[in-house]
Amino acid sequence: GSDGFFVAGRKAGIVLVTGSLTATFIGSSVVIGMVGIGYSMGLPGVWWLLVGAIGLVILGLFLAKKVRRVGVYTLPELLEKQYGSNAKLLASLVIVASWIAICAAQILAAGNVLHALISSWDIRALMVICAAVFVIYTVLGGQYSIIRTDFLQLIILVVGLLVTLGLVMNDVGGIRGLKDSLSQGFFSFPVSESFGWYNLVVFLILTGSVYVVGPDIYSRLFCARDERVARNSAFSAALAAIPIAFIVVLIGMGARALFPSISPSDQVFPTIIQQ
């Protein structure tokens, strides 16, 4: 039925919902982007995900239980119940327009990662394959297929990031070698000369707010077994974001020590994979 396809039967437990939430905001484009930020500015780059963790805590404290309680399928439906059909239409148009770009970025990032591994293939062909895989498992399995695939992708991603970090740190000479190779500004936290309090506030407003009202986030909460699972999953995903943020940025910092002249920054992660 519709519940099964759109919201996984509203039966997902905290492990699946947390895993799916985390995989949702730790996609290939975020990893590539954050590695590049770590390469460019160092530790302050973790705020790209840490503001998301703050947003998820706000979501868990004030909204997650209410969102799950309504029992709708989409964010526009939720807005319609609160503000009428005009709000639903406007939200639908905004989501479609913005998510064309977001999906394109994810496909581009996935294609870049695969191209780093299979350089003999045309990158456009790899992007088409990635897009086809996304569409096929979504159409065939619905949301339950998505959240299970998200969970598997998260495990693979975290293992891959840990292995990559270990290899990079080994080549650099550990944290001590990293400190010897980079200027002190790379280790300045929470702010630095290149990333001040103003930048942090802008990050919090523009990026953190996405985690409070994002349709991709809400679609996972709609799948939760009950209100308690929805709330606790938001908290758990926020907690998971913290170590992942530091792992990804440290990879970027290690890459800066090993390959100081990579440009543009979105080529840092593919370069690491190729090496």
Identify the role of each PLM range.
Residues 2, 43, 85, 123, ...:
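Membrane-helix interface/capping residues of multi-pass secondary transporters
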Residues 3-21:
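Loop-to-helix transition at the N-terminal end of transmembrane alpha-helices
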Residues 9, 93-97, 149, 236-237:
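Hydrophobic alpha-helical segments of secondary membrane carriers
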Residues 9-10, 16, 33-45, 80, ...:
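Loop-to-helix junctions at membrane interfaces in multi-pass transport proteins
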Residues 21-30, 53-56, 96-104, 156-159, ...:
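Membrane-embedded alpha-helical segments of transport systems
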Residues 23, 46-139, 206-210:
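Helix-loop-helix module between adjacent transmembrane segments
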